[in-house]
Amino acid sequence: SLPALESNTRQLLERQELLPPETYPGPHAVVQFPLSDGDTYQMLLSQPARQGADGIWCVERWLQGNGNLYYVYPETEVSAREYYADLQAQCDEGHQPWLLEPLEVAAEYIRQDLAQNSVGLEQLTLLENASLDDFYNLPNN
């Protein structure tokens, strides 16, 4: 499939150091979460438009317990840069303030994109100021 091909290409280019190891530079957060299969998964969250307390968060990539990696890009007609700049502007105007909270962003992604409605905020574990090593260090499943 095209998404799998794109993901494999990105992984290859990152390993060869032809692309930076993260999509968005700056601070990251790692969120661990259980899914219905019993495994613990994790996601890497980034601040794509502005870094700091007033910057929105997005899910950059997530990792299954078996090591399968999935990159996340907004499904939109505009570039990711434009998309996140618009979301940041909306948030600056007081709309969608939950985008400022990495746990809320993670929970929304789990519900909407992974269709796991039974996972609540209390089941999520947040590691702030995380590194890529933190993200790739899989929990024991």
What residue spans do the PLM features occupy?
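Mature extracytoplasmic domains of secretory-pathway proteins
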Residues: 1-27, 83-135
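Intrinsically disordered, low-complexity segments enriched in polar/charged residues with Gly/Pro
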Residues: 5, 30-31, 76
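Short beta-strand edge/turn micro-motifs at domain boundaries
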Residues: 37-76, 141
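Low-complexity, intrinsically disordered terminal/linker segments enriched in charged
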Residues: 60-94, 109
